[in-house]
Amino acid sequence: AVGQEFLRVLDERNFPIDELLLFGSSRSAGRKYTFRGKEIEVKLLQHNDDFKGVDIAFTSAGAGTSKEFAETITKYGAVMIDNSSAFRMDTDVPLVVPEVNPEDALTRPRGIIANPNCTTIQMVVALKAIENLTHIKRVHVSTYQAASGAGAAAMDELYEQYRQVLAGEPVTVEKFAYQLAFNLIPQIDVFTDNGYTKEEMKMFNETRKIMHSDIKVSATCVRVPALRSHSESIWIETERPVSIEEARKAFAEGDGLVLMDNPAEKEYPMPLFLAGKDPVYVGRIRKDLADENGLTFWIVGDQIKKGAALNAVQIAEYLIKVKNVG
Protein backbone atom coordinates (compact mmCIF):
# COMPACT_ATOMS: atom_id res chain seq x y z
CA ALA A 1 0.00 0.00 0.00
CA VAL A 2 2.78 2.45 0.90
CA GLY A 3 4.75 1.74 -2.28
CA GLN A 4 1.79 2.62 -4.49
CA GLU A 5 1.08 5.65 -2.30
CA PHE A 6 4.63 6.85 -3.01
CA LEU A 7 3.85 6.87 -6.74
CA ARG A 8 0.60 8.78 -6.16
CA VAL A 9 2.27 11.36 -3.90
CA LEU A 10 5.23 11.90 -6.25
CA ASP A 11 2.80 12.52 -9.11
CA GLU A 12 0.37 14.70 -7.12
CA ARG A 13 3.18 16.98 -5.95
CA ASN A 14 4.85 17.23 -9.38
CA PHE A 15 8.06 15.90 -7.86
CA PRO A 16 10.96 16.54 -10.28
CA ILE A 17 12.02 13.18 -11.74
CA ASP A 18 14.36 12.55 -14.67
CA GLU A 19 14.16 8.79 -14.32
CA LEU A 20 12.10 6.62 -11.98
CA LEU A 21 13.32 3.15 -11.06
CA LEU A 22 11.23 0.64 -9.12
CA PHE A 23 12.77 -2.20 -7.12
CA GLY A 24 11.17 -5.06 -5.23
CA SER A 25 11.46 -8.62 -3.99
CA SER A 26 11.26 -11.67 -6.23
CA ARG A 27 7.51 -11.58 -5.51
CA SER A 28 7.16 -8.07 -6.96
CA ALA A 29 9.82 -8.15 -9.69
CA GLY A 30 8.33 -8.08 -13.17
CA ARG A 31 5.16 -6.23 -12.16
CA LYS A 32 4.44 -3.11 -14.17
CA TYR A 33 3.21 0.25 -12.91
CA THR A 34 2.23 3.29 -14.93
CA PHE A 35 3.71 6.61 -13.82
CA ARG A 36 3.06 9.84 -15.74
CA GLY A 37 1.99 7.88 -18.79
CA LYS A 38 5.02 5.61 -18.85
CA GLU A 39 5.00 1.91 -17.96
CA ILE A 40 7.79 0.93 -15.54
CA GLU A 41 8.72 -2.64 -14.68
CA VAL A 42 9.79 -3.52 -11.14
CA LYS A 43 13.39 -4.74 -11.01
CA LEU A 44 14.66 -7.31 -8.55
CA LEU A 45 16.47 -5.64 -5.64
CA GLN A 46 19.99 -7.09 -5.62
CA HIS A 47 23.48 -6.36 -4.32
CA ASN A 48 24.81 -4.78 -7.52
CA ASP A 49 25.40 -1.36 -9.12
CA ASP A 50 21.75 -0.55 -9.96
CA PHE A 51 21.81 2.50 -7.66
CA LYS A 52 24.70 4.16 -9.47
CA GLY A 53 23.42 7.56 -10.61
CA VAL A 54 20.42 7.50 -8.26
CA ASP A 55 19.98 10.70 -6.20
CA ILE A 56 17.14 9.71 -3.86
CA ALA A 57 15.92 6.25 -2.88
CA PHE A 58 12.62 5.85 -1.04
CA THR A 59 12.57 2.51 0.78
CA SER A 60 9.54 0.87 2.35
CA ALA A 61 10.29 -2.85 2.42
CA GLY A 62 10.63 -3.58 6.13
CA ALA A 63 13.49 -3.27 8.60
CA GLY A 64 15.29 -6.45 7.57
CA THR A 65 15.47 -5.49 3.89
CA SER A 66 16.50 -1.92 4.72
CA LYS A 67 19.38 -3.12 6.91
CA GLU A 68 20.52 -5.66 4.34
CA PHE A 69 20.54 -3.27 1.37
CA ALA A 70 21.41 0.10 2.95
CA GLU A 71 25.05 -0.03 1.91
CA THR A 72 24.19 -1.17 -1.63
CA ILE A 73 21.67 1.68 -1.99
CA THR A 74 23.89 4.46 -0.60
CA LYS A 75 27.39 3.48 -1.76
CA TYR A 76 27.30 5.68 -4.88
CA GLY A 77 25.87 8.72 -3.08
CA ALA A 78 22.11 8.14 -3.12
CA VAL A 79 20.20 9.53 -0.15
CA MET A 80 18.14 6.70 1.32
CA ILE A 81 14.89 7.88 2.92
CA ASP A 82 13.75 4.83 4.83
CA ASN A 83 10.21 4.18 6.00
CA SER A 84 11.05 1.19 8.22
CA SER A 85 12.00 1.09 11.90
CA ALA A 86 15.53 -0.14 11.07
CA PHE A 87 17.50 3.05 11.70
CA ARG A 88 15.17 5.39 13.58
CA MET A 89 17.02 5.39 16.89
CA ASP A 90 20.56 5.12 15.45
CA THR A 91 22.57 8.14 16.61
CA ASP A 92 24.13 8.62 13.15
CA VAL A 93 20.78 8.58 11.30
CA PRO A 94 18.50 11.65 11.45
CA LEU A 95 14.80 11.06 12.20
CA VAL A 96 12.90 13.77 10.37
CA VAL A 97 9.46 15.37 10.16
CA PRO A 98 9.84 18.40 7.85
CA GLU A 99 7.39 20.59 9.79
CA VAL A 100 9.40 20.01 12.97
CA ASN A 101 13.12 19.36 12.34
CA PRO A 102 13.94 19.61 8.61
CA GLU A 103 17.53 20.76 9.19
CA ASP A 104 18.35 17.42 10.85
CA ALA A 105 18.17 15.88 7.35
CA LEU A 106 21.32 17.79 6.36
CA THR A 107 23.54 15.75 8.72
CA ARG A 108 23.44 12.13 7.55
CA PRO A 109 26.87 10.46 7.85
CA ARG A 110 25.57 7.16 6.50
CA GLY A 111 23.50 8.69 3.71
CA ILE A 112 20.31 7.52 5.44
CA ILE A 113 17.35 9.55 6.71
CA ALA A 114 14.70 7.72 8.74
CA ASN A 115 10.97 8.32 8.43
CA PRO A 116 9.34 8.09 11.89
CA ASN A 117 6.47 5.84 12.88
CA CYS A 118 3.09 6.99 11.55
CA THR A 119 1.57 7.73 14.98
CA THR A 120 4.62 9.75 16.01
CA ILE A 121 4.61 11.82 12.81
CA GLN A 122 1.09 13.14 13.15
CA MET A 123 1.49 13.77 16.88
CA VAL A 124 4.73 15.79 16.64
CA VAL A 125 3.30 17.97 13.84
CA ALA A 126 0.60 19.02 16.32
CA LEU A 127 2.96 19.23 19.33
CA LYS A 128 5.33 21.53 17.44
CA ALA A 129 2.64 24.23 17.22
CA ILE A 130 2.37 24.33 21.03
CA GLU A 131 6.11 23.84 21.65
CA ASN A 132 6.61 27.10 19.70
CA LEU A 133 4.61 28.83 22.48
CA THR A 134 6.00 27.09 25.55
CA HIS A 135 7.87 23.90 26.39
CA ILE A 136 5.78 20.72 26.58
CA LYS A 137 6.80 18.65 29.61
CA ARG A 138 4.51 15.65 29.40
CA VAL A 139 2.18 13.93 26.94
CA HIS A 140 -0.42 11.25 27.48
CA VAL A 141 -1.81 9.85 24.24
CA SER A 142 -4.27 7.15 23.28
CA THR A 143 -4.27 6.14 19.63
CA TYR A 144 -7.12 4.77 17.54
CA GLN A 145 -5.27 3.09 14.69
CA ALA A 146 -7.01 1.95 11.51
CA ALA A 147 -6.75 -1.59 10.15
CA SER A 148 -4.76 -0.51 7.10
CA GLY A 149 -1.90 0.46 9.41
CA ALA A 150 -1.18 -3.27 9.47
CA GLY A 151 -1.14 -3.43 5.65
CA ALA A 152 -3.53 -3.83 2.73
CA ALA A 153 -4.17 -7.50 3.58
CA ALA A 154 -5.26 -6.48 7.09
CA MET A 155 -7.76 -4.02 5.64
CA ASP A 156 -9.10 -6.78 3.37
CA GLU A 157 -9.43 -9.07 6.40
CA LEU A 158 -11.51 -6.46 8.23
CA TYR A 159 -13.89 -6.21 5.25
CA GLU A 160 -14.14 -10.00 5.16
CA GLN A 161 -14.71 -10.25 8.93
CA TYR A 162 -17.64 -7.84 8.75
CA ARG A 163 -19.12 -9.87 5.88
CA GLN A 164 -18.62 -13.13 7.78
CA VAL A 165 -20.17 -11.82 11.01
CA LEU A 166 -23.21 -10.42 9.20
CA ALA A 167 -23.62 -13.67 7.23
CA GLY A 168 -23.35 -15.78 10.39
CA GLU A 169 -20.19 -17.50 9.14
CA PRO A 170 -17.05 -18.42 11.14
CA VAL A 171 -14.69 -15.44 11.30
CA THR A 172 -11.22 -15.60 9.71
CA VAL A 173 -8.51 -14.22 12.03
CA GLU A 174 -5.01 -14.09 10.54
CA LYS A 175 -3.63 -10.54 10.50
CA PHE A 176 -4.60 -9.57 14.04
CA ALA A 177 -4.46 -11.36 17.40
CA TYR A 178 -8.26 -11.32 17.59
CA GLN A 179 -11.29 -10.52 15.47
CA LEU A 180 -11.19 -6.77 14.76
CA ALA A 181 -14.69 -6.37 13.31
CA PHE A 182 -17.02 -4.99 16.02
CA ASN A 183 -14.03 -4.96 18.40
CA LEU A 184 -11.02 -2.98 19.67
CA ILE A 185 -7.60 -4.53 20.30
CA PRO A 186 -5.43 -2.70 22.88
CA GLN A 187 -2.18 -4.10 21.51
CA ILE A 188 -0.14 -2.99 18.49
CA ASP A 189 3.21 -4.79 18.07
CA VAL A 190 4.75 -6.96 20.80
CA PHE A 191 4.94 -6.15 24.51
CA THR A 192 8.23 -5.01 26.05
CA ASP A 193 9.52 -5.67 29.56
CA ASN A 194 7.92 -2.51 30.99
CA GLY A 195 4.40 -3.53 29.93
CA TYR A 196 4.26 -1.08 27.01
CA THR A 197 4.17 -2.32 23.42
CA LYS A 198 6.91 -1.54 20.91
CA GLU A 199 4.47 0.82 19.15
CA GLU A 200 3.95 2.73 22.40
CA MET A 201 7.69 2.94 23.10
CA LYS A 202 8.28 4.24 19.56
CA MET A 203 6.09 7.23 20.45
CA PHE A 204 8.18 7.87 23.58
CA ASN A 205 11.62 7.51 22.01
CA GLU A 206 10.99 8.98 18.56
CA THR A 207 9.24 12.10 19.89
CA ARG A 208 12.24 12.96 22.08
CA LYS A 209 14.67 12.50 19.19
CA ILE A 210 12.65 14.51 16.65
CA MET A 211 11.89 17.39 19.02
CA HIS A 212 15.35 17.39 20.68
CA SER A 213 13.45 17.44 23.94
CA ASP A 214 13.24 15.84 27.38
CA ILE A 215 9.49 15.48 26.79
CA LYS A 216 7.94 12.39 28.40
CA VAL A 217 5.31 10.50 26.39
CA SER A 218 3.04 7.81 27.82
CA ALA A 219 1.04 6.07 25.09
CA THR A 220 -1.69 3.46 24.77
CA CYS A 221 -2.01 2.24 21.18
CA VAL A 222 -5.27 0.60 20.12
CA ARG A 223 -6.28 -1.05 16.84
CA VAL A 224 -9.82 -0.01 15.86
CA PRO A 225 -12.12 -1.28 13.08
CA ALA A 226 -11.74 1.83 10.92
CA LEU A 227 -10.24 1.33 7.47
CA ARG A 228 -7.84 4.22 6.99
CA SER A 229 -6.48 7.21 8.97
CA HIS A 230 -5.27 7.11 12.56
CA SER A 231 -6.82 9.19 15.34
CA GLU A 232 -5.19 10.27 18.60
CA SER A 233 -6.52 11.70 21.85
CA ILE A 234 -3.71 13.82 23.29
CA TRP A 235 -3.23 15.46 26.70
CA ILE A 236 -0.24 17.73 27.25
CA GLU A 237 1.27 19.52 30.24
CA THR A 238 3.14 22.73 29.39
CA GLU A 239 5.57 24.88 31.40
CA ARG A 240 3.10 27.75 31.45
CA PRO A 241 -0.66 27.75 30.95
CA VAL A 242 -1.80 28.01 27.31
CA SER A 243 -5.25 29.47 26.68
CA ILE A 244 -7.71 27.89 24.26
CA GLU A 245 -7.42 30.99 22.06
CA GLU A 246 -3.61 30.70 21.94
CA ALA A 247 -3.80 27.00 21.16
CA ARG A 248 -6.38 27.46 18.40
CA LYS A 249 -4.30 30.21 16.80
CA ALA A 250 -1.14 28.08 17.01
CA PHE A 251 -2.86 25.08 15.43
CA ALA A 252 -4.51 27.22 12.74
CA GLU A 253 -1.13 28.69 11.75
CA GLY A 254 0.94 25.52 12.27
CA ASP A 255 2.74 23.92 9.34
CA GLY A 256 0.93 20.85 8.06
CA LEU A 257 -2.08 21.39 10.32
CA VAL A 258 -5.75 22.16 9.69
CA LEU A 259 -7.91 23.42 12.55
CA MET A 260 -11.31 21.68 12.55
CA ASP A 261 -12.80 22.68 15.86
CA ASN A 262 -16.39 23.88 15.97
CA PRO A 263 -18.24 21.73 18.51
CA ALA A 264 -21.45 23.79 18.25
CA GLU A 265 -21.76 22.66 14.63
CA LYS A 266 -20.47 19.13 15.37
CA GLU A 267 -17.28 19.88 13.43
CA TYR A 268 -14.27 17.81 14.47
CA PRO A 269 -11.84 15.49 12.67
CA MET A 270 -13.02 11.96 11.84
CA PRO A 271 -11.07 9.25 10.01
CA LEU A 272 -13.91 8.32 7.65
CA PHE A 273 -13.86 11.76 6.04
CA LEU A 274 -10.12 12.49 6.11
CA ALA A 275 -8.63 9.42 4.42
CA GLY A 276 -6.42 10.46 1.51
CA LYS A 277 -5.84 14.00 2.84
CA ASP A 278 -2.35 15.45 3.34
CA PRO A 279 -2.59 17.51 6.57
CA VAL A 280 -3.03 16.56 10.21
CA TYR A 281 -6.42 17.78 11.45
CA VAL A 282 -6.89 19.12 14.99
CA GLY A 283 -10.10 19.54 16.98
CA ARG A 284 -11.80 19.07 20.38
CA ILE A 285 -9.37 21.58 21.94
CA ARG A 286 -10.03 21.99 25.68
CA LYS A 287 -8.38 23.15 28.89
CA ASP A 288 -7.59 20.17 31.06
CA LEU A 289 -9.88 20.04 34.10
CA ALA A 290 -7.24 18.27 36.19
CA ASP A 291 -4.23 20.54 35.53
CA GLU A 292 -4.12 24.30 34.92
CA ASN A 293 -1.07 23.81 32.67
CA GLY A 294 -2.86 21.09 30.72
CA LEU A 295 -4.49 21.04 27.29
CA THR A 296 -6.30 18.19 25.58
CA PHE A 297 -7.12 17.80 21.90
CA TRP A 298 -7.91 15.26 19.18
CA ILE A 299 -6.05 14.73 15.92
CA VAL A 300 -6.62 12.67 12.77
CA GLY A 301 -4.15 11.97 9.97
CA ASP A 302 -3.88 9.55 7.07
CA GLN A 303 -1.20 7.12 8.20
CA ILE A 304 -0.36 6.02 4.65
CA LYS A 305 0.03 9.61 3.41
CA LYS A 306 1.45 11.90 6.12
CA GLY A 307 2.28 8.88 8.24
CA ALA A 308 4.51 7.37 5.55
CA ALA A 309 4.81 8.31 1.86
CA LEU A 310 4.05 12.04 2.06
CA ASN A 311 6.48 12.66 4.93
CA ALA A 312 9.28 10.91 3.03
CA VAL A 313 8.59 12.89 -0.15
CA GLN A 314 8.50 16.14 1.86
CA ILE A 315 11.96 15.29 3.24
CA ALA A 316 13.22 14.88 -0.34
CA GLU A 317 11.56 18.16 -1.37
CA TYR A 318 13.36 19.93 1.46
CA LEU A 319 16.73 18.52 0.36
CA ILE A 320 16.08 19.70 -3.21
CA LYS A 321 14.96 23.14 -1.99
CA VAL A 322 18.16 23.70 -0.01
CA LYS A 323 20.27 22.13 -2.79
CA ASN A 324 21.52 19.34 -0.55
CA VAL A 325 21.05 16.43 -2.93
CA GLY A 326 22.04 15.39 -6.44
Please annotate each region the language model reported.
Residues L7, F204-R208, R248, A252:
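Generic solvent-exposed, charged/amphipathic alpha-helical segments
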Residues K175-L227:
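Oxyanion-binding "anion nests"
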Residues A1-L180, K216, R240, K249, ...:
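N-terminal Rossmann-like NAD(P) cofactor-binding subdomain of oxidoreductases
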Residues G149-A152, T192-G195, A226-S229, I244-E245:
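Short acidic/glycine-rich loop or secondary-structure boundary segments that cap or lie
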